């Protein structure tokens, strides 16, 4: 029986699960994570109250800048640069993105990327860390509160991370992550307002939790809402969707249907909506000064052909293509 068992394991290892998949499983709650999330959210609500009643304007502006900077570090850095290699970055930009990503407190880049590459390779299956087949709560935040599914662990070992494991910037972050995240995400955001404009430590700390919680939910929303509500202009057979409103609050990450079809595109969206796609503008700026280069994108012809073949008949704004054609003729009559 031994040879059969080994052969079965090899076959099992190389078999890609078919989505949607959510086999019955036991959930083992990680209570330490639950308690951290409870504290963060209660503290953030208190911080929001302080922001409206007691905090200095400098503290509010300071935390807003941290929120925006951390958001760009996740969308441009963890996601488009390191997860999908959609563009390349010179050392100064890599260091900047790594430090700001640490400030967002969303795992080290290497852990973030492994989970995200798993998500793309095994989307909506038991090997997907945030499997949307298990419901919107699970894909949003619940997956972080329980131990990983055995398939996530098993398939995670097969994900190729060789392009990042020898990156000195990411190796440094991984090695010193507990120290760095404590300093960047908690100590500095609390102490800087106290030292520079005499904010109270209580207010500075709790207001800083607001940007931490809101920034986390910004990322979580792509894993959950962008797999539940919206249009599917590129591929109607998959769960990822496109949402203009979600793009507004996620710096351009809401064009998720497009992204799952063309994950290599640094824009994560078609041309024509870049003024909503702040991350694309962020990358374009650093390309202009020479810190970002080799920006990859799908050609308009490639996008049009795929949309015609598998799309749901909507355009990049979520409108029916027939309606879009009528509007175009009104603006540009032949």
What are these regions (language model features)?
Residues 1-220, 225, 265-334:
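Non-catalytic, topology-defining segments of multipass membrane proteins
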Residues 161-169, 232-255, 261-262:
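Active-site-proximal inter-transmembrane loops
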Residues 207-245, 249-250:
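Alpha-helical transmembrane anchor segments
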Residues 257-259, 294-295:
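Conserved active-site loop/cleft motifs that coordinate metal ions or position small ligands
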